[in-house]
Design a protein with these regions (language model features):
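C-terminal motif of bacterial Sec signal peptides marking the signal peptidase cleavage site
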Residues: 15-18
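Sec-dependent signal peptide recognition
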Residues: 2-10
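Short, conserved catalytic or interaction motifs in soluble domains
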Residues: 21
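N-terminal helix-cap/turn-to-beta initiation motif at the start of protein domains
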Residues: 29-51, 66
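Contiguous, well-ordered beta-strand patches that form the walls/edges
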Residues: 55-60, 78-157, 164
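Structural signal for glycine-centered tight turns and loop->strand junctions in beta-sheet-rich domains
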Residues: 69-73, 154
Length: 181
């Protein structure tokens, strides 16, 4: 009986210690403040439709993203690749083939000051993208914390995941577009 009574007292003490305030305590006040500032500055500019296209000899890539004010996201990706081969001593390209990551998708987005790696010293402005393909594939279209650079009335710039420019960034342009290929 004494053990049972002692256990009840310990459990009640733990419950009272965990619930001593109705106000939640922020774990990282600096990250919270920077996240709020990031959203005040850029979230309204993010809302809308953006597109990015990159065409090279061996690949063609198009992506369109629509960011909604409620934190939802819809998008489309078209990606094709081909190989350079030598036939009878002549270099040629194979036919274009669709990459499996092509398709339409939907999900969520948010801006946050954080460290995707979980280390305080690597915190930065991030664009968090979580999206599944509309045809219910086993893999996701996005599950990524991209380093966010900026958004303006005309340009949205963040670190590329699948395809990127020479500097490691992708610069989406505002507006609706269709792939040129």
């Amino acid at each position: 009986m004494n053990k049972f009574f002692y256990l009840i007292i310990v459990l009640m003490t733990i419950m009272l210690a965990c619930c001593n305030s109705s106000d939640p305590e922020l774990v990282d006040r600096e990250a919270q403040e920077k996240t709020e500032a990031l959203n005040r500055q850029y979230a309204p500019l993010m809302v809308g439709t953006w597109y990015y296209e990159k065409i090279e000899d061996k690949q063609r890539y198009f992506e369109q993203l629509t960011f909604h004010s409620d934190g939802t996201l819809t998008g489309e990706r078209k990606w094709q690749k081909r190989e350079q081969v030598t036939i009878d001593g002549i270099q040629r390209y194979t036919d274009w083939e669709n990459v499996d990551l092509s398709g339409t998708f939907s999900g969520t987005w948010s801006l946050k000051y954080c460290s995707p790696e979980g280390r305080t010293e690597t915190r930065r402005n991030c664009l968090l993208l979580e999206a599944r393909y509309d045809d219910e594939r086993a893999y996701m279209a996005y599950s990524h914390a991209a380093t966010f650079d900026y958004a303006s009335e005309t340009t949205l710039r963040f670190q590329g995941l699948y395809v990127k420019d020479e500097d490691g960034w992708v610069s989406f342009q505002r507006g609706n577009a269709e792939p040129s290929f």
